[in-house]
């Protein structure tokens, strides 16, 4: 009887933990909603736990997509996380289950963001929202954390792009580290997605870089830590944030797009690859078309195309629904998420 009860309890905890898993899915650029058009969406909402594996770069099973989101140096992108694919509701926590830990953003300059695998180039950190002591808190669980800020801001986190960042293609690596089981080696959970962006109007900064895998070790104090005890100090893993980047104080509240952006304000005439629908080919970063119908209104079906494997439908989704040639919008996790899959 006891063994049966243990099995039931273990299964219940596993289900609860799985439900609490999450994915960085959408990207906003200066308040414009690009949905998942330039995101290498992970195949599931499960975490990466082996920091020495290839999966720590951009998550398991991901590959390049055709879409690239245009970003201006000095501008702001907003990464967006939710537990289930395609669910952008603020009713549920972005990442549940008391998955407290830091949120960090890295960039890697590449020749072509749609094909680079992220393992050959160097990475540098441009943003960190890690930890701060909460007055009256007893243990680390009670403190302020980056993932707690994600929950408070409907899964959104504003990230400033350094104004002196050189122009060109980049992979933007968004990482949320959950520390609820990190008291033992291999217990930390990394939730990672890579976005493909093209930066324009940049400068000439030259940043020191690290490589993934290699930048983290399972025994790093920011990775192996018991947050169910008193936490007197916490330093997030990896290098320091580069000059021109941002270190946000955990618990400082929602700002900018985190609190004001409305789902559905997506570009109405940006084709896959981030090029203007008019077909401009001068090599410069594209201009972003004004959202159709005003702020908060969805793009009209057919007004823009969704890149291969990008989101094209689902509960609360109001972006583009027409897939690129050779792809059809198919339900992957109904009713939450549909994506453009090869037409069979």
UniProtKB/Swiss-Prot annotation:
Pfam families, alphabetized: AA9, CBM_1
Cofactor notes: Binds 1 copper ion per subunit.
Coiled-coil ranges (or none): none
Biotechnology: Lignocellulose is the most abundant polymeric composite on Earth and is a recalcitrant but promising renewable substrate for industrial biotechnology applications. Together with cellobiose dehydrogenases (CDHs) an enzymatic system capable of oxidative cellulose cleavage is formed, which increases the efficiency of cellulases and put LPMOs at focus of biofuel research.
Binding positions for Cu(2+) per the UniProt entry: 21, 99, 191
Compositional bias annotation for Low complexity: 285-301
Keywords from the named record: Carbohydrate metabolism, Cellulose degradation, Copper, Disulfide bond, Metal-binding, Monooxygenase, Oxidoreductase, Polysaccharide degradation, Secreted, Signal
Cofactors demanded by this protein: Cu(2+)
EC number(s) on file: 1.14.99.56
Region (Disordered): 272-301
Broad class of enzyme this protein falls into: oxidoreductase
GO biological process: cellulose catabolic process
Covalent S-S links between cysteines: 58-194
GO molecular function: cellulose binding; metal ion binding; monooxygenase activity
Reaction catalysed by this enzyme: [(1->4)-beta-D-glucosyl]n+m + reduced acceptor + O2 = 4-dehydro-beta-D-glucosyl-[(1->4)-beta-D-glucosyl]n-1 + [(1->4)-beta-D-glucosyl]m + acceptor + H2O
Residues in the signal sequence: 1-20
Residue ranges of domain CBM1 in the record: 304-341
Origin: domain of life: Eukaryota
InterPro entries: AA9, AA9_LPMO, CBD_sf, Cellulose-bd_dom_fun
Entry binding sites for O2: 180, 189
Compartments where located: Secreted
Protein family per UniProt: Belongs to the polysaccharide monooxygenase AA9 family.
Functional summary from the UniProt entry: Lytic polysaccharide monooxygenase (LPMO) that depolymerizes crystalline and amorphous polysaccharides via the oxidation of scissile alpha- or beta-(1-4)-glycosidic bonds, yielding C4 oxidation products. Catalysis by LPMOs requires the reduction of the active-site copper from Cu(II) to Cu(I) by a reducing agent and H(2)O(2) or O(2) as a cosubstrate.
Comment field on protein domains: Has a modular structure: an endo-beta-1,4-glucanase catalytic module at the N-terminus, a linker rich in serines and threonines, and a C-terminal carbohydrate-binding module (CBM). The CBM domain is essential for binding to and subsequent oxidative degradation of polysaccharide substrate.
Record-given protein name: AA9 family lytic polysaccharide monooxygenase J
Source organism per UniProt: Neurospora crassa (strain ATCC 24698 / 74-OR23-1A / CBS 708.71 / DSM 1257 / FGSC 987)
């Amino acid at each position: 009887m006891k063994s049966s009860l243990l099995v039931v309890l273990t299964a219940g905890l596993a289900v609860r933990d799985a439900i609490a898993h999450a994915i960085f899915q959408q990207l906003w650029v200066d308040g414009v909603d690009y949905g998942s058009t330039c995101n290498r969406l992970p195949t599931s909402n499960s975490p990466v736990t082996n920091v020495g594996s290839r999966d720590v770069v951009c998550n398991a099973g991901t590959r390049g997509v055709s879409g690239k989101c245009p970003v201006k140096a000095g501008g702001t992108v907003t990464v967006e996380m939710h537990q289930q694919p395609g669910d952008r509701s603020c009713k549920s926590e972005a990442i549940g289950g008391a998955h407290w830990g830091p949120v960090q953003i890295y960039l890697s300059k590449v020749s072509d963001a749609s094909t680079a695998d992220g393992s050959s180039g160097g990475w540098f950190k441009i943003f960190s929202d890690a930890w701060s002591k909460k007055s009256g808190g007893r243990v680390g669980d009670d403190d302020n954390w980056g993932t707690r800020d994600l929950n408070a801001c409907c899964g959104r986190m504003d990230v400033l792009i350094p104004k002196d960042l050189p122009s060109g293609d980049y992979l933007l690596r968004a990482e949320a580290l959950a520390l609820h089981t990190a008291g033992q080696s291999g217990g930390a959970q990394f939730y990672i997605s890579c976005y493909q962006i093209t930066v324009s109007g940049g400068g000439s900064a030259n940043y020191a870089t690290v490589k993934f895998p290699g930048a983290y070790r399972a025994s790093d104090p920011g990775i192996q830590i018991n947050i169910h005890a008193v936490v007197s100090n916490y330093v997030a893993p990896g290098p320091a944030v580069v000059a021109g980047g941002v270190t946000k104080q955990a618990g400082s509240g929602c700002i900018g797009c985190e609190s004001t952006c409305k789902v559905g304000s997506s570009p109405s005439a940006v084709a896959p690859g981030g090029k203007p629908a008019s077909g401009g080919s001068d090599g410069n970063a594209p201009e972003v078309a004004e959202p159709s119908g005003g702020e908060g209104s969805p793009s009209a079906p057919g007004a823009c195309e969704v890149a291969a494997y990008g989101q094209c439908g689902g509960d609360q989704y109001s972006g583009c629904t027409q897939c690129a040639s050779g792809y059809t919008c198919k339900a992957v996790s109904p009713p939450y998420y549909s994506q453009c899959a090869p037409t069979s």
